Swiss-Prot record:
GO terms for molecular function: proton-transporting ATP synthase activity, rotational mechanism; proton-transporting ATPase activity, rotational mechanism. GO terms for cellular component: plasma membrane-derived thylakoid membrane; proton-transporting ATP synthase complex. This is ATP synthase subunit b'. Its main location: membrane. It comes from the Bacteria. Belongs to the ATPase B chain family. F-type ATPases have 2 components, F(1) - the catalytic core - and F(0) - the membrane proton channel. F(1) has five subunits: alpha(3), beta(3), gamma(1), delta(1), epsilon(1). F(0) has four main subunits: a(1), b(1), b'(1) and c(10-14). The alpha and beta chains form an alternating ring which encloses part of the gamma chain. F(1) is attached to F(0) by a central stalk formed by the gamma and epsilon chains, while a peripheral stalk is formed by the delta, b and b' chains. It is found in: Cellular thylakoid membrane. F(1)F(0) ATP synthase produces ATP from ADP in the presence of a proton or sodium gradient. F-type ATPases consist of two structural domains, F(1) containing the extramembraneous catalytic core and F(0) containing the membrane proton channel, linked together by a central stalk and a peripheral stalk. During catalysis, ATP synthesis in the catalytic domain of F(1) is coupled via a rotary mechanism of the central stalk subunits to proton translocation. Component of the F(0) channel, it forms part of the peripheral stalk, linking F(1) to F(0). The b'-subunit is a diverged and duplicated form of b found in plants and photosynthetic bacteria. The chain crosses the membrane at residues 6-26. Keywords: ATP synthesis, CF(0), Hydrogen ion transport, Ion transport, Membrane, Thylakoid, Transmembrane, Transmembrane helix, Transport. Pfam families: ATP-synt_B.
């Protein structure tokens, strides 16, 4: 069935030589290429992770700065509104004081004019009363 002659060891030797040649010519360069490609992918993946971490840190920092800016702007707006309200309240108080002063001055003037009118009216009433009495009683009895 099988003949054991020199061809079998020769075929085994050829197989080993072919394996060594293929290993030297094909498998080692291919392995080196695959290893270098894996290293390249790993380094790119690490760089991508680092850049992603930096981007996330920057995003967090910008969000914090944005929050701080919003808080500061809200504080500035609140301060400006409070100041505007204070100024408006002062102006209103001043206007009310001026209105009250004008009202009091007008009331004094009205009271003064009323007193003058009453004095003039009393004088006229006295004069008219005297005239009426003179007409009724005569001018000699009224003096």
């Amino acid at each position: 069935m099988f003949d054991f002659d020199a061809t079998l060891p020769l075929m085994a030797l050829q197989f080993l030589v072919l394996a060594v040649v293929l290993n030297a010519v094909f498998y080692k360069p291919l392995g080196k290429a695959l290893d270098s490609r894996a290293d390249y992918i790993r380094s790119n993946e690490n760089q991508a992770r680092e850049q992603l971490a930096k981007a996330q840190n920057l995003a967090q920092e910008y969000e914090k700065q944005l929050g701080d800016a919003r808080r500061q702007s809200n504080e500035i707006i609140a301060a400006a509104q409070a100041q505007a309200k204070q100024i408006a309240d002062e102006k209103i108080a001043q206007a009310q004081k001026e209105a009250q002063a004008q009202k009091e001055a007008a009331a004094k003037e009205i009271e003064q004019q009323k007193q003058e009118a009453m004095t003039a009216l009393e004088q006229q009433v006295d004069a008219l009363s005297r005239q009426i009495l003179e007409k009724i009683l005569g001018s000699e009895l009224v003096k």
